[in-house]
């Protein structure tokens, strides 16, 4: 990595606009393949000691283009046969190296922009804020005072040319963009690489980093409108003039359809101090203390912005307006609700006493049991009704490996859903996994569950399923020995960076 940084220490005034030569740097591809494939494939087999080999990369690109016009779509074929060989290696491997290396090159301008932004600024590194659980204390603190919420599913780009057009505002090197446009448009299979799948994307396994970069950039452009409106409602804070003029042009496009001609009036309509925005992957939440009319204006505004700026039809049904008092938010695997908690206060005045009834709003997070049963059923731990089953594919493992796998799955689920207000759903998941583990072991030893547990002892399974790692966490409940309060205590851990997926239990 240090060598990579030294190679990138160029004059920034020149490097900002010219990233095309970096495509022909071999260390770029070695860096891209540092985790996974052999990182020195190019260096070991080319015979060159220098770090730049224009000829071999150029020949490789020409070879890929020739193969494309021969309608031999080897890039994402299921079998890696010997018919697609180039320089003694499989062409799939080289195509993957090109696209992953290209992803590294395109990320460089954004990395340099971040470094220039952080220069001269002292920022506290809070790695714990990267945890997914860190968002729930924020929701608990803010959402209990809000009224309406917009459930937003971010649309996918129907044409990759839209991504190129937005990318050119940040990457000034026309040569690199032309090469990117060529690969995205000339391969017929590109059209099926990014396909809508619920609220996210289905990426190619071989080129996940490349398309993940394009998707994140697309989402970043979607969210730019929120930053713009926030800056405008805060008395025109410092903002890029290019972005400002670009948004002005957008208002001119749709002013006859949506707004009045007064630009200040446009900003005033959306000046809302109690507006909060949260997003994870392709799903976002926009909550406000305003009225239903204001939320409908927001919905209409967002739909028109996405249609005019991205030149695509944005379905209004992808944005739902709900009232927090009677709606549950399905976000990050939790069901979040804002409910009224009755509160009775007894007031004593000399000889008379009064009972005052009041209600306060409380933000609750619950673990949805139905989707979890569905996930466990899909992974063959139980049936659709939640009845535990054995895991035949694990019967060939040792007893300790089987118990450790089941225990690890439960600990991961318990770790993630520790913020659930009620733990009964988690106890049911524990029951399913424990009995599934026992049935798997009994199947392996050709015995009954009762006989096997009698010989093994229930305590061993209990030990594996209750073992917990020592990590930092946040809890807002008062310390108490009352079992009822302990049952309802919520714990937010600071080491969770992704939603637990049963599909990755292997």
Swiss-Prot record:
Chief location: plastid
GO CC term, one of those recorded: chloroplast
Domain of life: Eukaryota
Keywords: Chloroplast, mRNA processing, Plastid, RNA-binding, tRNA processing
The protein's role, per its UniProt record: Usually encoded in the trnK tRNA gene intron. Probably assists in splicing its own and other chloroplast group II introns.
Subcellular location: Plastid, Chloroplast
Organism the protein comes from: Rhododendron ferrugineum
Family to which this protein belongs: Belongs to the intron maturase 2 family. MatK subfamily.
Cross-referenced InterPro entries: Domain_X, Maturase_MatK, Maturase_MatK_N
Record's protein name: Maturase K
GO biological process: mRNA processing; RNA splicing; tRNA processing
UniProt GO molecular function: RNA binding
């Amino acid at each position: 990595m240090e060598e990579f940084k030294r190679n990138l220490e160029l004059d920034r005034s020149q490097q900002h606009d010219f990233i095309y030569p970096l495509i022909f740097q071999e260390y770029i591809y070695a860096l891209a393949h540092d985790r996974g494939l052999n990182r020195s494939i190019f260096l070991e087999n080319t015979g060159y000691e220098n770090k730049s080999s224009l000829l071999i990369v150029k020949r490789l690109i020409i070879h890929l283009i020739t193969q494309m016009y021969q309608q031999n779509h080897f890039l994402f074929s299921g079998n890696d046969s010997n018919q697609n060989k180039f320089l003694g290696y499989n062409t799939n491997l080289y195509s993957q190296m090109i696209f992953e290396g290209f992803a590294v090159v395109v990320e460089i301008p954004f990395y340099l922009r971040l470094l220039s932004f952080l220069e001269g600024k002292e920022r506290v590194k809070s790695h714990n804020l990267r945890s997914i659980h860190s968002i729930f204390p924020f929701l608990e603190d803010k959402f209990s005072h809000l009224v309406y919420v917009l459930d937003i599913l971010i649309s996918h780009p129907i044409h990759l040319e839209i991504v190129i057009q937005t990318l050119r505002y940040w990457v000034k090197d026309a040569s690199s963009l032309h090469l990117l446009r060529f690969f995205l448009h000339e391969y017929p299979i590109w059209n099926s690489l990014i396909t809508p799948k619920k609220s996210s994307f289905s990426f190619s396994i071989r080129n996940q980093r490349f398309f993940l970069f394009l998707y994140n950039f697309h989402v970043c452009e979607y969210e730019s409108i929120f930053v713009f409106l926030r800056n405008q409602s805060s008395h025109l804070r410092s903002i890029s003039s290019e972005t400002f003029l670009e948004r002005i042009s957008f208002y001119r496009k749709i002013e006859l359809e949506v707004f009045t001609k007064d630009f200040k009036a446009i900003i005033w309509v959306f000046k809302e101090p109690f507006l909060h925005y949260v997003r994870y992957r392709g799903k976002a939440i926009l909550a406000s203390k305003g009225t239903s009319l204001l939320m409908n204006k927001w919905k209409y505004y967002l739909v028109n912005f996405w249609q005019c700026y991205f030149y695509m039809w944005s379905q209004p049904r992808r944005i739902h307006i709900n009232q927090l008092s009677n709606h549950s938010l399905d976000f990050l695997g939790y069901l979040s609700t804002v409910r009224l908690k009755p509160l009775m206060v007894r007031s004593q005045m000399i000889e008379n006493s009064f009972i005052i009834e009041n209600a306060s709003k409380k933000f609750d997070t619950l673990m949805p049991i139905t989707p979890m049963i569905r996930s466990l059923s899909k992974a063959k731990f139980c049936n659709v009704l939640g009845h535990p089953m054995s895991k035949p594919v694990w019967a060939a493992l040792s007893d300790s490996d089987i118990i450790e796998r089941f225990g690890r799955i439960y600990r991961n689920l318990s770790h993630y859903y520790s913020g659930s207000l009620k733990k009964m759903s988690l106890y049911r998941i524990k029951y399913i996994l424990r009995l599934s583990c026992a049935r798997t072991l009994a199947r392996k030893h050709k015995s009954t569950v009762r006989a096997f547990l009698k010989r093994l002892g229930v305590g061993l399974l209990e030990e594996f399923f209750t073992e917990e790692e020592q990590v930092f966490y946040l809890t807002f409940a008062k310390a108490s020995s009352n079992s009822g309060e302990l049952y309802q205590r919520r714990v937010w851990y600071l080491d969770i960076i992704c939603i637990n997926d049963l599909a990755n239990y292997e």
